[in-house]
């Protein structure tokens, strides 16, 4: 079974994946698999460009694949980690990214971009709001989903997180000023 651990940068994917690996799970990153299968197209501005379609066609991995593109690999299960954009902004500030890249990622989180893509590519999709959870709580939620725990799968079914409605008052106020 192929399980994608995905989400906007800063939601906790790498930290969760590292701990799951320590607990004995078979974990790989999208970049590791792309290197193994010769699916790296280019490196632009220090970022690796991956041919995701080729990788999805060639992948023979059984386990957890971590990365913000992992849900595009046609996984059996996609677990999308989410984070309130206000908190996510603080998490991403320390990454020395341009304001443009920061805003692009915040916008993607607000608009559910990765969740929507996961729903298009994965057989089963779950979403976990990591905003106020400890790392251990997130890991426990991920493990429960992997185990097939019915309560966890019900609790983390997609559609429960809506950042835009939380910001609705602010958006309306802004629109009145325009």
From Swiss-Prot:
Signal sequence, start to end: none
UniProt entry tagged with the keyword Cell membrane: no
Report the GO molecular function annotations: adenylate kinase activity; ATP binding; ATP hydrolysis activity
Keywords, ordered alphabetically: ATP-binding, Kinase, Nucleotide-binding, Ribosome biogenesis, rRNA processing, Transferase
UniProt key word Repressor: no
Which Pfam families would you find in this protein's record? AAA_18 (PF13238)
Q: What is its EC number?
A: 2.7.4.3
- Going by the record, the broad EC class of this enzyme is transferase
Region of interest (NMP), residue spans: 29-50
Function text: Broad-specificity nucleoside monophosphate (NMP) kinase that catalyzes the reversible transfer of the terminal phosphate group between nucleoside triphosphates and monophosphates. Also has ATPase activity. Involved in the late maturation steps of the 30S ribosomal particles, specifically 16S rRNA maturation. While NMP activity is not required for ribosome maturation, ATPase activity is. Associates transiently with small ribosomal subunit protein uS11. ATP hydrolysis breaks the interaction with uS11.
State the protein's name. Putative adenylate kinase
Question: What species does this protein belong to?
Answer: Archaeoglobus fulgidus (strain ATCC 49558 / DSM 4304 / JCM 9628 / NBRC 100126 / VC-16)
């Amino acid at each position: 079974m192929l399980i994608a651990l995905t989400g906007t940068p800063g939601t906790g994917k790498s930290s969760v994946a590292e701990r799951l690996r320590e607990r004995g799970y078979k974990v790989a990153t999208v970049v590791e698999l792309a290197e193994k299968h010769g699916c790296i197209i280019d490196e632009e501005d220090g970022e690796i460009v991956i041919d995701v379609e080729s990788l999805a066609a060639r992948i023979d991995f059984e386990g957890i694949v971590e990365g913000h593109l992992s849900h595009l690999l046609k996984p059996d299960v996609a677990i999308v980690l989410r984070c309130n954009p206000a908190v996510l902004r603080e998490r991403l500030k320390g990454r020395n990214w341009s304001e443009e890249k920061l805003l692009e990622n915040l916008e993607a989180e607000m608009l559910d971009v990765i969740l929507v893509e996961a729903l298009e590519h994965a057989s089963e999709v779950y979403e976990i709001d990591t905003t106020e959870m400890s790392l251990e709580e997130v890991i426990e939620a991920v493990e429960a989903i992997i185990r097939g725990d019915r309560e966890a799968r019900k609790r983390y079914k997609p559609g429960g997180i809506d950042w835009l409605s939380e910001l609705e008052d602010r958006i309306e106020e802004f629109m009145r000023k325009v």
